[in-house]
Amino acid sequence: MEVIVLVELNNDNFENETSKGLKLIEFYTTWCTYCRNQRIELEGFKESDMWIGLVDGDECPNLVQKFGINGFPTFILLRDGEKIAQFVGFYEKSQL
């Protein structure tokens, strides 16, 4: 069975969860309308086998600063903990 895994990340688990492999991370805030709409798009991946990390930008300002996040939602792609790409804004499922 194929599933999507949405993992809430924070200061305590970020490094452990993202240090190995290819990881897609969304930085969001609860007050951002685009972020709420983005969550609906992410939940549309239930028919694929994909791991997506979620970071609340208000709760983890040090991670926002570390990765140079200037707006929400922002996606970063990590390979073995190193940022290899960054995408800012709302994306439909087909664009991700």
Language-model regions: role of each:
Residues M1-N16:
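N-terminal "domain-start" segment that seeds a small globular fold
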Residues E15, C60-L63, S94:
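Short loop/turn elements that flank and shape the SAM/SAH-binding pocket of Class I
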Residues L22-K23, D49, P73:
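Alpha/beta-hydrolase fold active-site loops
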Residues Y34-S48:
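Typically the conserved alpha-helix immediately C-terminal to a functionally engaged Cys/Sec
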Residues V7-L9, F27, K46-L63, I69:
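Thiol-based oxidoreductase modules, predominantly thioredoxin-like and allied folds used
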Residues C32-C35, F75:
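The canonical Cys-X-X-Cys-His
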Residues T18-T30:
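Short active-site neighborhood of thiol/selenol oxidoreductases, capturing the structured segment around
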Residues G71, I76-L96:
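Non-catalytic, surface beta->alpha helical segment in thiol-disulfide oxidoreductase systems
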